[in-house]
Amino acid sequence: MQNDIEERKSDLMTDLWYKGKETRIKQDKQEKRVQMKNIVIFGAPGSGKGTQSDLMIEHYGLEHISTGDVLRSEIKKGTELGNTAKGFIDNGQLIPDELMIDILASVYDSFGRSHKGVIFDGFPRTIPQAEALKKMLDERGDKVAAMIELDVPEDELMKRLIKRGQESGRADDNEETIKKRLVVYHQQTQPLIEWYKKEGLHHHIDGLGTLERIFADIKSIIDNL
């Protein structure tokens, strides 16, 4: 009889330990979700997206994932994912979403579990990519906290980009090329903006004004996440 009681006590203690562990894991995940502020930033060429991303990195200590930079880095390092991506690029093909997500996941995981959040710049560009990003983060107990759209009127974007082209001598910053780039940007992002609105994550920022005022608007969003 005594042995039976002791066994039941032991089983109960074991059960309580496992339940406690599950609760702690769940709490850790919830805390991580609260602490991490993963931001998707949208902005047409010339919107000041790069400048505002730099300010967010400096102020909040966020990591930054720019798809263009990541691809160049992976290819330069000769990683398996980079070499696979290079094969598609060399053949004039688009990089499949699955491969792009694998590359982003690899970079995201390299930050460890103590980072404060990530700015996703240049990704997603399509709704399937947004869904894949959501799934990738969810598998890690994380999520996109906000999608921030820097909205600048097209005539102002044209002025900024033409001026930039004149100052830098960039041939791709002529008026005709700029118009094409802006058309492509709006075609790509409008469905995504609607998708993020449905997710309750879309935040609109007026991209006209001083850097300080625009960043103050961004801070008011991030500080209340």
What residue ranges belong to the model's regions?
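Glycine-rich phosphate-binding loop of ATP-dependent small-molecule kinases
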Residues: 3-225
